[in-house]
Amino acid sequence: MLSRRIIPCLDVRDGRVVKGVKFRDHIDMGDIVELAMRYRDQGADELVFYDIGASPEGRSVDYAWVGRVARLIDIPFCVAGGIRDVETARAVLHAGADKISINSPALGRPQLISELADAFGVQCVVVGIDSIREEDGQWRVRRYTGDPSKTQALPMRTLDWVAEAQRLGAGEIVLNCMDNDGVRHGYDIAQLRQVRALCRVPLIASGGAGEMQHFADVFDQADADGALAASVFHSGAIPIPELKRFLRAQQIEVRDGQ
């Protein structure tokens, strides 16, 4: 069995790491590079950086901080934010990122997934999906969630988009469960199970981690390949070394770290 991955998520705005609740009311959490180095030292398996303002503002990610992170850490990291074409993706990878993640731009032009997979290989292409449960009980996709004033509700069902993204060449899916984001009540196991049933590529769970058992649950009950979290790591509520010891005690395979 492949080891499960523990992945701190760093939302970036104006050159700083921020964190909100349900994608709203963001507060400053610290310096990008300092937090990246802290998580590297604690034994994180990889990092994900979301420039949450890039797509709503119609710009690309700032390559300068990508380069600084790449020079100082030796674990894989993924970058998302305003990647609309192969040239921008190439610049992000050239700056030092190991993977690129696309979300809103792919919803506007799904063929972008195939273009990136053809250019760099599926192993470099992550598709992030911001999903929320509607009143009719269906999970549907949101776009431009980094800016509450520009967020768009789309008619597309989350499960349909997962299937389409895979068909087009996504090498990994990150499911951001918006209803659970930042509230620390646990991952959305029901939704993740449905996505897992049709997801043939690695599935990363995001949104809702509040205690160590939540990580064990998402691995055992939803068979996620990795668990992404932000607030519990930024605040120090869950130290990564302790989390890995806890998971090993429950016979969940995780990579060596502190």
Curated annotation (Swiss-Prot):
Protein name per UniProt: Imidazole glycerol phosphate synthase subunit HisF
SUPFAM superfamilies assigned: Ribulose-phoshate binding barrel
InterPro entries: Aldolase_TIM, His_biosynth, HisF, IGPS_HisA/HisF, RibuloseP-bd_barrel
Keyword Amino-acid biosynthesis: yes
GO cellular component, as recorded: cytoplasm
Biological role stated in the UniProt entry: IGPS catalyzes the conversion of PRFAR and glutamine to IGP, AICAR and glutamate. The HisF subunit catalyzes the cyclization activity that produces IGP and AICAR from PRFAR using the ammonia provided by the HisH subunit.
Keyword Cell inner membrane among UniProt keywords: no
Catalytic activity: 5-[(5-phospho-1-deoxy-D-ribulos-1-ylimino)methylamino]-1-(5-phospho-beta-D-ribosyl)imidazole-4-carboxamide + L-glutamine = D-erythro-1-(imidazol-4-yl)glycerol 3-phosphate + 5-amino-1-(5-phospho-beta-D-ribosyl)imidazole-4-carboxamide + L-glutamate + H(+)
Pathway recorded for this protein: Amino-acid biosynthesis; L-histidine biosynthesis; L-histidine from 5-phospho-alpha-D-ribose 1-diphosphate: step 5/9
Name of the gene: hisF
Its EC number(s): 4.3.2.10
An example molecular function term from Gene Ontology annotations: lyase activity
Keywords, sorted A to Z: Amino-acid biosynthesis, Cytoplasm, Histidine biosynthesis, Lyase
CDD domains: HisF
Originating organism: Xanthomonas campestris pv. campestris (strain B100)
SUBUNIT field: Heterodimer of HisH and HisF.
Major subcellular location class: cytoplasm
One record GO biological process: L-histidine biosynthetic process
